[in-house]
Swiss-Prot record:
GO MF term list: rRNA binding; structural constituent of ribosome
Pfam families named in the record: Ribosomal_S14
GO cellular component: cytoplasm; small ribosomal subunit
GO BP field: translation
Record organism: Afipia carboxidovorans (strain ATCC 49405 / DSM 1227 / KCTC 32145 / OM5) (Oligotropha carboxidovorans)
Protein name: Small ribosomal subunit protein uS14
């Protein structure tokens, strides 16, 4: 099990990203628009830099929904390899069968 504080910190980051996504996209569009004057683009760059670091999507860590484990998490199921193996062996994941040859 991951520390509750680590899981909560990641959840807080997800909320911040969701709240600031529109503003970030608007500022990035201004920065990328070469037809705008350089001063306006520079001002947008400064506003983007002033935003909280945790409002950036790259700060979010994929964590297991079951255990909170940060490593070896499959995006499709949002579960770690350990949780998938555990649930699969109990027959709780439809279509998942243990491989043998």
């Amino acid at each position: 099990m991951a520390k509750k504080s680590s899981v909560e910190k990641n959840n807080r980051r997800q909320r911040m990203v969701k709240n600031a996504a529109a503003k970030r996209a608007r500022l990035k569009a201004i920065i990328a628009d070469k037809t705008k004057p350089m001063e306006e683009r520079f001002a947008a760059t400064m506003k983007l830099a002033e935003m909280p670091r945790n409002s950036s999507a790259t700060r979010i860590k994929n964590r297991c929904e079951i255990s909170g484990r940060p490593h070896s998490v499959y995006r499709k199921t949002k579960m770690s390899r350990i949780a998938i193996r555990d649930f699969g062996s109990r027959g709780l994941i439809p279509g998942l069968v243990k491989s043998s040859w």
